């Protein structure tokens, strides 16, 4: 049941993207990016709202043209989640979306232009209280760094980042975060490790262009898991060639696995074998779909037999241990008198889980109230 994470977070400064705190011990923010055409306002708004529904803290939107900037204005008016404008090549687009209430500007050092252009963006951001993300990517390094290093290396990515960190420092602008993304896990991990030793600004994590839903999730979990376990990272995005909603789900699953940020149900379920007394896979899949709206952090174990079932149930908020015809049910580690019919588990478990979530929410509300009074 909800053990505390042993991970000690890297100290960092604090910025805000809209009303979302980033860095300095704030919860690690999970974000995604729209893949609609930004000029299709209705489709983009719909996708942003679907991301917000599954818990996205921040959403990034590509703004490649002035026409897209005008569409961004309309999009911003229709959503409540903080929006980051993704800017490449034309710094003037950053100035335009700043007028329309953007919550953060992402600029790419590899293509945004010279220091004078960066100064224009920084001056505008300062005037309007907008933070910036320096977003370095292994696939779009500056040409001189490509020539110097021959290929993307941790040193090349970090040198690119530090050039722009130094510019922002000279301009006395400290409201920024940094990312050094690469599609190779070790390149990304080593780049972030090196950067973390050089600056104390918040770091945005990601394995860029990670791949499809399955392979990309695994690659991201490995790479980001390594960094997060070392305390590195203040916000993250899982980059998948898939529905952006999956990026949010995977991001929270990674944080949940490391006990860094728990949101929703942590299902402990066996892969099933011939000893299973009920359909474990079907039961878990059905419960995951039915209970996506439950945000209460809790552990629920669904084990198909008595080999590991009781042991897992004893350390879960709720647990089911498969047995012949009727399965044993546990709450807070204690076996209950009632047993569940193996042919009708999903509805019974859903009701129990929702009731438990409500009780935990009420307990948490009371605990918070007592802390505030003290």
From Swiss-Prot:
Cofactor remark: Binds 1 [4Fe-4S] cluster.
Keyword 4Fe-4S: yes
EC number: 1.17.7.3
Catalytic reaction(s) noted: (2E)-4-hydroxy-3-methylbut-2-enyl diphosphate + oxidized [flavodoxin] + H2O + 2 H(+) = 2-C-methyl-D-erythritol 2,4-cyclic diphosphate + reduced [flavodoxin]
Job of this protein: Converts 2C-methyl-D-erythritol 2,4-cyclodiphosphate (ME-2,4cPP) into 1-hydroxy-2-methyl-2-(E)-butenyl 4-diphosphate.
Metabolic or biological pathway: Isoprenoid biosynthesis; isopentenyl diphosphate biosynthesis via DXP pathway; isopentenyl diphosphate from 1-deoxy-D-xylulose 5-phosphate: step 5/6
Protein name: 4-hydroxy-3-methylbut-2-en-1-yl diphosphate synthase (flavodoxin)
GO BP field: isopentenyl diphosphate biosynthetic process, methylerythritol 4-phosphate pathway; terpenoid biosynthetic process
Family of the protein in this entry: Belongs to the IspG family.
NCBIfam families named among the record's database cross-references: ispG_gcpE, PRK00366.1
Keywords, in A-Z order: 4Fe-4S, Iron, Iron-sulfur, Isoprene biosynthesis, Metal-binding, Oxidoreductase
Residue runs in coiled coils: none
Enzyme kind, highest EC tier: oxidoreductase
A Pfam family that the UniProt record links to this protein: GcpE
A GO term, aspect molecular function: 4 iron, 4 sulfur cluster binding
Cofactors demanded by this protein: [4Fe-4S] cluster
């Amino acid at each position: 049941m909800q053990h505390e994470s042993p991970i000690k977070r890297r100290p960092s400064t604090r910025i805000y993207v809209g009303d979302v705190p980033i860095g300095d011990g704030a919860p690690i923010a999970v974000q995604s990016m729209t893949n609609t055409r930004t000029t299709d306002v209705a489709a983009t708004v719909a996708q942003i709202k679907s991301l917000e529904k599954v818990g996205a803290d921040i959403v990034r939107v590509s703004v490649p043209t002035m026409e897209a900037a005008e569409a961004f204005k309309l999009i911003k008016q229709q959503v409540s989640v903080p929006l980051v404008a993704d800017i490449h090549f034309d710094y003037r687009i950053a100035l335009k979306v700043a007028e329309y209430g953007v919550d953060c500007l992402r600029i790419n050092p590899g293509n945004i232009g010279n220091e004078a252009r960066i100064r224009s963006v920084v001056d505008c951001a300062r005037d309007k209280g907008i933070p910036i993300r320096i977003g370095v990517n292994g696939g779009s390094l500056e040409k001189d760094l490509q020539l110097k290093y021959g290929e993307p290396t941790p040193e090349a990515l970090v040198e690119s980042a530090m050039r722009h960190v130094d510019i922002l420092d000279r301009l006395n602008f400290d409201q920024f975060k940094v990312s050094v993304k690469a599609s190779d896990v070790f390149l990304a991990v080593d780049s972030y490790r090196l950067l973390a030793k050089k600056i104390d600004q918040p770091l945005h994590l990601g394995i860029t262009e990670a791949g499809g839903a399955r392979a990309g999730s695994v690659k991201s979990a490995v790479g980001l898991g390594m960094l997060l376990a070392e305390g590195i990272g203040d916000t993250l995005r899982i980059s998948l060639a898939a529905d952006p909603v999956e990026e949010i789900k995977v991001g929270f699953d990674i944080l949940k696995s490391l006990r860094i940020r728990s949101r929703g149900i942590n299902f402990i379920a066996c892969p099933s074998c011939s000893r299973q007394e009920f359909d474990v896979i079907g039961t878990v899949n059905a419960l995951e779909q039915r209970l996506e709206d439950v945000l209460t952090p809790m552990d629920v174990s669904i084990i198909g037999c008595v080999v590991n079932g009781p042991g897992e149930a004893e350390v879960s908020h709720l647990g089911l241990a498969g047995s012949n015809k009727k399965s044993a049910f546990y709450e807070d580690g204690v076996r209950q008198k009632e047993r569940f019919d193996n042919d009708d588990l999903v509805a019974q478990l859903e009701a129990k889980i929702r009731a438990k979530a409500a009780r935990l929410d009420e307990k948490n509300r009371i605990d918070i109230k007592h802390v505030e009074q003290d």
